[in-house]
Amino acid sequence: MGTTYKQSGVDIEAGDAFVERIKPHAARTMRPEVMGGVGGFGGLFALPPGKYQQPVLVAGTDGVGTKLKVAFAAGRHGTVGIDLVAMSVNDILTCGAEPLFFLDYFATGRLEVDDAAEVVKGIALGCEQAGCALLGGETAEMPGFYARGEYDLAGFCVGVVERAAIIDGKSVKPGDALIGLPSSGLHSNGYSLARKVLLDDGKLALDATPEGLDRPLVDALLEPTRIYVKDVLALLQAVKVKGLAHITGSGIPGNLPRCLPDGTRAVLSEQTWPKPPIFDLIAKLGSVARDEMFNTFNMGLGLILVVAKEDVAQALSVLSGRGVQAFEVGRVEAGQGEATAVIDP
């Protein structure tokens, strides 16, 4: 008998077993618009006729970054799938889009079916939280390309928004208010710095509970990214939101100006919102400067909305009614040139 594909490191049978394992998870995310099931060459999704007047499709893609390194070290794979979904659906949400469907790409050197199934279980949970269908995906087993026990993830999301309802920041003006929605922690950004400070240089054990934290370090580091979709879509039914920023890599200074017009600047007061203790731990242990912290991490705000000052009370009330404690964190002022964001101590 000649050399087989399995002998070269690609196990087709394991791949087939994996697909069977994840079908029930994908099935839980299905929407009425989905045509067919998991396993086809392409996923089919039919926009219902008459539901939209001028539908505009919005697409986004992202990964989880080196947060995966923490999952590998801890042997915990159940939450990074939520992160994967969150990063893309929160991105397209900034346009006012409702996520419709999601696809994932899972790449590894050797397929460990149990670990991979845990990842996809998390992806399905994230899709449920976002209200979108897990329409399909790709599993790539590439021997010699990844270290044993490691993998990488990429996610792709498509949503829809009415053309007249697109949030583009063009109507933002001086005097408007900024509302911050709290993050659950680091979300999925800044992990290269966090790992260097806490694990490489700080020599902290993942199962340790450092001073200042109320739980083991691994729990704080693997806390999944918050998915804001359902709360914000509900808010959009009650309040005109002029701008939305997903606070990811580059922090507030790098992301908030993306939803502001030129000639304006956002001014935030750091004392107006609470920060998860993981940020203080990183800053203290690594002697990380304040500007570096704000340019790397979300610093406690995962999403920032721009609304008219007179709409602040209603916006906070709507969010509070959904169990979201949001905060008025600043204002929009007149500026010069390209939009900027500053955070006052």
UniProtKB/Swiss-Prot annotation:
It is found in: Cytoplasm. One of its GO terms (cellular component) is cytosol. It is an enzyme of class 6 (ligase). GO terms for molecular function: ATP binding; phosphoribosylamine-glycine ligase activity; phosphoribosylformylglycinamidine cyclo-ligase activity. One of its GO terms (biological process) is 'de novo' IMP biosynthetic process. SUPFAM superfamilies: PurM C-terminal domain-like, PurM N-terminal domain-like. Gene3D superfamilies: PurM-like C-terminal domain, PurM-like, N-terminal domain. NCBIfam families: purM. PANTHER family: TRIFUNCTIONAL PURINE BIOSYNTHETIC PROTEIN ADENOSINE-3, TRIFUNCTIONAL PURINE BIOSYNTHETIC PROTEIN ADENOSINE-3-RELATED. Belongs to the AIR synthase family. HAMAP family: AIRS. This is Phosphoribosylformylglycinamidine cyclo-ligase. It comes from Myxococcus xanthus (strain DK1622). The gene is purM.
